[in-house]
């Protein structure tokens, strides 16, 4: 099972990724984790990546693809792998294809942007303990106060409506085109000797369990 998980920030990809990893016994491939591990290990690609990161520059796609290919050779990828948060752009998807990285499924978790804004901007956090609430879905007993300590709850900057909307705009511009890219490739079939992935789209609305069952059904 080799798959890419697509969906906007706040669509619930992380939660579903955990279910998929457990069910199929595959690792989640995170480019951030890979970069940190390569830098720490001092591998040639890691040293090169560190140069870009220390200069505050983006690590080039070609270098990231090199790290991906190295990572996929490890024994835990024998039964497959799950990409979450990569590729983010058409250029990265093209680079993956050219590198011969095989993908069986592309699974999109579809949630309307208005729902994502409500989900994320309604979050409230107790700073000291990390306990989280939601003004609509999981409200505290007393508005604005932590259930255990009675201390005030905060809204993290990441959860503020304007921040959420900006993240969704970036997703719309950069990553959403991948949905068309993989959908079209699935229809065209094999290219350059690489089998086209099957494209699946599920609704990300409903309970966590309902979405999990939809995901498992889509990956049969």
Swiss-Prot record:
EC number(s) per entry: 2.7.4.3
Location of this chain's protein in the cell: Cytoplasm
Gene Ontology biological process terms from the UniProt entry: AMP salvage
Location, primary (coarse class): cytoplasm
Pfam annotation, one family: ADK
Keyword Electron transport: no
Gene Ontology CC annotation, any one: cytoplasm
Gene Ontology terms, MF aspect: adenylate kinase activity; ATP binding
InterPro entries: Adenyl_kin_sub, Adenylat/UMP-CMP_kin, Adenylat_kinase_CS, Adenylate_kinase_lid-dom, P-loop_NTPase
Pathway(s) it belongs to: Purine metabolism; AMP biosynthesis via salvage pathway; AMP from ADP: step 1/1
Source organism, top-level taxon: Bacteria
Region feature LID, mapped onto this chain: 122-159
Keywords: ATP-binding, Cytoplasm, Kinase, Nucleotide biosynthesis, Nucleotide-binding, Transferase
Methyltransferase as UniProt keyword: no
Protein name: Adenylate kinase
Organism: Burkholderia vietnamiensis (strain G4 / LMG 22486)
Gene encoding the protein: adk
């Amino acid at each position: 099972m080799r798959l890419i998980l697509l969906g906007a920030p706040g669509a619930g990809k992380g939660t579903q990724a955990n279910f998929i990893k457990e069910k199929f016994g595959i690792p989640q491939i995170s480019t951030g984790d890979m970069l940190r591990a390569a830098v720490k290990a001092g591998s040639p690609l890691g040293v090169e990546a560190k140069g870009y990161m220390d200069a505050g520059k983006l690590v080039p796609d070609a270098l990231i693809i090199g790290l991906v290919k190295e990572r996929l050779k490890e024994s835990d990828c024998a039964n497959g792998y799950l990409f979450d948060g990569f590729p983010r752009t058409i250029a990265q998807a093209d680079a993956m294809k050219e590198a011969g990285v095989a993908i069986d499924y592309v699974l999109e978790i579809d949630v309307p942007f208005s729902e994502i804004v409500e989900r994320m901007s309604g979050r409230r956090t107790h700073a000291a303990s990390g306990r989280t609430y939601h003004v609509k879905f999981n409200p505290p007993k007393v508005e604005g106060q932590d259930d255990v300590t009675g201390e005030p709850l905060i809204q993290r900057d990441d959860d503020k409506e304007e921040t959420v909307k900006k993240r969704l705009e970036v997703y719309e511009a950069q990553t959403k085109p991948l949905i068309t890219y993989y959908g079209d490739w699935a229809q065209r079939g094999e290219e350059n000797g690489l089998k086209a992935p099957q494209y699946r789209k599920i609704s990300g609305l409903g309970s966590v369990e309902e979405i999990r069952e939809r995901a498992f059904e889509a990956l049969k």
